[in-house]
Amino acid sequence: MLTATAQPATKTVRLKVIETSDVHGHFFPYDFMEKKPIKGTLVRANSYINKQRAKYGDNLLLIDNGDILQGQPCVYWSNYVMPEDENLAATVINYMKYDAETVGNHDIEPGHKVYDKWIREVRCPVLGANIVKEEYKNGEAAPDHIYTNLKPYSVHYKDGVKICVIGMLTPAIPNWLNKSIWKGIEFEEMVSCAKKWVKYIQDNEKPDLIFGLFHSGLNGGIKTDEYEEDGTESVAREVPGFDIIFFGHDHQVHNEWITNKEGKKVLCIDPSCYVKNVAEAEIELTYKNGHLVKKDIKGKIVSVLDEEIDQQMLNHFQPTIDKIKTYVNRRIGRFEHPIYTRESFFGNSAFTDLVHNLQMRISKAEISFNAPLAFNTIIKAGDVTQGDMFKLYRFENLMFVLRMTGEEVRKHLEFSYDMWVNTMTSPDDHALRLNDASKDDQQRTGFQYYTFNFDSAAGIDYSSFF
């Protein structure tokens, strides 16, 4: 006797997710500071993305992880010189058809007027689950608690697959930026924030996949009793529910699996900065009778340094590029002698003298603090242009005048020098605190600590006592 039995209906769905992070204005294959072509950038990344769109169709998800509003003169020009036009970063995001965007610390730093407008102009969801209206800090998971025009998460449907993306920003903003820049906002600690939003999403959305999109490094950075600057690893370990965490902020490449407290492995991937790479995840989902029974996830870092230029995109933005070149080539002064930022790391330098003198002249302060923000930049003798100033300060800085005691000044300088200068115990020791492992780190350039903390002072008369 033969009987017919129904075989379970099996369906396989293949998806690809591509992440960019810490773009810092690297939209076009041209360095507006050095005035020369460069590799990578979004114009090259878009060529790769278009190839993947041709392969995956609507099953491709494109996400960006913030820090897009500072870094190259083109974004400064858009933020402050041409503020009435649509923000250039928003225009580029919209042109490339991103599906989701997060906010980075360098997107907060330009100030309310810039980032509020940028958020409104971006057409895809801009995410910030831990960026809340100040009256709701550490409250329940509620979409109306999130800062104006931001969303805690986005929802995407790809071939029947429901995906939720939770966005978060490093909560260390108060360590760097004056409250006036983020008035009305609070930044929640990442682990507790992730826990409440994962539960909210699981209860209310019931997705097939949950991704994190975190502008926060893997680990390390600033740690206080209230928060961790680089909290991605902590979230991956302590908050079950994530399938993949796409992250950034630390300007380092990561592609690793972290085991959470339930024993499940979570892919954590970071493409680093300046669109030299993209991070991607290939996902294969297997369904039987409508039920998800298997997830296969693979992470990969893809270099786009030598990818072909998307000529159509370049042509589209060429009129804007020409206007920016006119701006950065504008003459603003003249140097009789060249200045080198490298000298600032080893002693007196014309660069630090320039900044110290300007700060004391403008502020009328008695003492100036200044740290070099570029390791090996040169401004040649001769005409100085607007673009040259970005060589000294890639990310625009604000000047603050503080009232300090002599003891506070001493402690501040000791704190700086302790990170900068090594205590030699043998002739073989380095005079400076060096670290070979950080040679490729954009913010440490071979030093043990971040060079933006290497403050020197001007205006102090020193005396020696023996």
Residue ranges and their predicted role:
Residues 1-5:
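C-terminal segment of classical bacterial N-terminal signal peptides
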Residues 6-306, 346-358, 368:
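Acidic, metal/ion-coordinating pockets
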Residues 13-16, 26, 34-36, 40-44, ...:
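Feature captures C-terminal
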Residues 42, 86, 111-112, 207, ...:
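Alpha-helix initiation and N-capping motif
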Residues 181-183, 287, 312, 419-420, ...:
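Short, charged/polar low-complexity linear motifs in solvent-exposed/disordered segments
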Residues 292, 296-391, 419-424:
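Hard-cation-handling environments
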